[in-house]
């Protein structure tokens, strides 16, 4: 059951921002860079994806939305300019624009407006519109309560392998598409079942070397732990199922 205070709160995720990628063969350009198959990105089906290092470590994670022939990137507001700069390095002489655009990302845990979050249906609904209304105050607690991590603070930047971020289980990677930055090591880990560590949410404790983020107000922390030593980590159904099944 969704908490009434969350249901009645605002919907605008003020810590998110949008980038518009447009121009010649935009999907082909992003297909060779990102972890997600661009053919899966439609107006009704946004997709979670990432830009990785060549070694397969997460640099930026975001949600991709179709906008006609263009693609909108729903990313951390604090990382928008850095992400634009990074993507622009790969543009070379392509007739492609990568620009910040106005607009807000909105969320509700249980309204029929928008589309289900591509990572996990239980996260709720997400949609894009003008930056209007009150801020969504319950998003972080709702997300972490489901064991889902996101953003540079929690995932790290050039620190955590993408599959250690539970990308396979939460739909953030395609193993059927062609090459992209970081694909070789990511695919090798998947097919050899070599994902030995996982980012997990746990009750707040003494921070250590493996701690990525702490939220004293929520009594929670995010840590990278070995799968045989998850300890008191929250174990949502999706993670339990993932650890019980061999990779396909």
Predicted regions and their residues:
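Basic, glycine/lysine-rich polyanion-binding surfaces/domains
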Residues: 1-248
């Amino acid at each position: 059951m969704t908490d009434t205070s969350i249901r009645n709160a605002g919907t605008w995720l003020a810590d998110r921002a949008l980038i518009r990628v447009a121009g010649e063969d935009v999907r082909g350009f992003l297909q060779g860079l990102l972890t997600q198959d661009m053919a899966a990105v439609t107006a009704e089906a946004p997709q979670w994806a990432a830009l990785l290092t060549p070694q397969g470590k997460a640099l930026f994670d975001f949600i991709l939305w179709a906008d006609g022939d263009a693609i909108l990137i729903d990313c951390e507001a604090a990382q928008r300019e850095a992400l634009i700069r990074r993507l622009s390095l790969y543009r070379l002489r392509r007739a492609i624009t990568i620009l910040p655009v106005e607009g807000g990302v909105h969320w509700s845990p249980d309204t029929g407006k928008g589309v289900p979050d591509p990572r996990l249906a239980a996260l709720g609904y997400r949609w894009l519109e003008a930056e209007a209304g009150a801020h969504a105050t319950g998003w972080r607690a709702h997300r972490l309560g489901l064991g889902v991590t996101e953003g540079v603070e929690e995932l790290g930047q050039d620190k955590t392998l993408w599959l250690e971020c539970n990308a396979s289980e939460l739909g953030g990677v395609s193993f059927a598409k062609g090459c992209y930055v970081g694909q070789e090591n990511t695919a090798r880990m998947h097919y050899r079942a070599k994902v030995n560590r996982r980012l997990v949410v746990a009750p707040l404790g003494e921070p250590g070397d493996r701690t990525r983020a702490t939220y004293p107000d929520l009594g929670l922390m995010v840590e990278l732990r070995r799968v045989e030593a998850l300890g008191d980590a929250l174990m949502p159904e999706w993670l339990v199922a993932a650890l019980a099944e061999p990779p396909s």
